[in-house]
């Protein structure tokens, strides 16, 4: 029974880890949404080149912040979003058989892997900004895929905990 109780606690740790990553991905999503808003603004023909340069400054700051989040998001001193959190095993059963482990992998989420590292919205016309809009949309799709994968893992862990708690109780 103690082994099963610990397995349940391990699964709960896994949920906490996933929630930490998800919280950071949520922030990155918000930054990408803001970048999209800025790109749409920069694409407007009423802007001057100087206006677009100011918009570019904010975009550059958002890119820097995405990378900061990528390199500083941790759980129990393990980096989560820099691409090194791969095939981490959670022991969710009392025995060491293969079916009692759940693996978690989190892709690198940085301005580079999202394709926005060199995003440009400045210039004399809105052409760079128009290109940036589709680049940002693709980045959001990539991010949403990772968020979906993490959500599925969290759901699986929640069901695992319910089952383990039921076994312990009975």
Please annotate each region the language model reported.
Residues 1-170:
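Primary detection of the long, small/polar-rich alpha-helical "axial" segments characteristic
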